[in-house]
Amino acid sequence: MRLRIAILLGIMLLAGGVSAQQQPVYSQYMMNPFLINPAIAGYQGYTDFNLIGREQWLGYSEGPSTYALSGQTRILRTSYRNRSRVIRSRSRRRRPSGRVGVGGLIYTDNNGAMSRTGFQGTYAYHIYARDIQYSAGISLSAFQFKANVSGDDLYDGRDPSLDGIRPGYSPDANVGFLVSGDFFYAGLSATNLFQNAIQFGGGTAETAYRLLRHYNVIAGYKYQERRSDYGFEPSIMLAFTERLSWTLDINFKAYYKEDYWAGISYRTAGAVVTMFGMNYQNFYFGYAFDYGFGDIPTIAKLGSHEIMIGMRLGDSARRYRWLNRF
């Protein structure tokens, strides 16, 4: 009986590579790329707090869901409230060399019979060369994998061999790199560096599953004519595992006065995402809807909803002139 459960859990964890959702899935990562790349921490200069909630397969009670709370900033010796005054008084001075960003993330990802809850702390370092910023970041994390099974789901509840199914606790690490300028960015990140073996039941070989390393490549270009209220941002994200299973997102976003935006994304995994959002003072809001199509389970065509709320403090437009950095 334990072997039967091991086989079922293994299919849930590993089948389909990227699509197996060993990692949380987000649609609005373009608004908060810190979710997928630790090098993002502090790269734009402002302080950002972000809350995101995602419900997949609307109408199905056991559909996947993801919730995440993140924060990231640049470490400075002056508070964000005083930066504009410092910038105005010393704007002609050359920017210093050292840059440090920090961040944190708490998340829970429920994938039906499996759930993953964890947190991470991030350190990033940024340097400049000829108006190009080079960033590197590392996140140290801890997470818990848990099997959400009951007697009615998988087995005869009287079977004592299943009493050993228990959560597994594991440390892990992520790394990321980013190159960015005034109008472009490109980055690479890797997660599950430790490739932890998640164990269920008695912890034998038949109930152990090793997590795959996941890689994300992002790139985008921001275009806006001078004195124009409109801007555009095409971008891509390539996600793949060490087994070379992959999916590609092709994205396009349009802005109006930096206060309103809308976008569309095509995923080769079989989904089209529409999204829109707005900024109001220090706050921003975003919504995305995923519609599945093609050779995917019928249940996945019910669609997914994702809501994002965030707050940004500070002035990112003048980040290159900030002084008194660490």
Where are these regions (language model features)?
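Sec/Tat signal peptide C-region and signal peptidase I cleavage site
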Residues: 16-20
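Sec-dependent N-terminal signal peptides
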Residues: 4-14
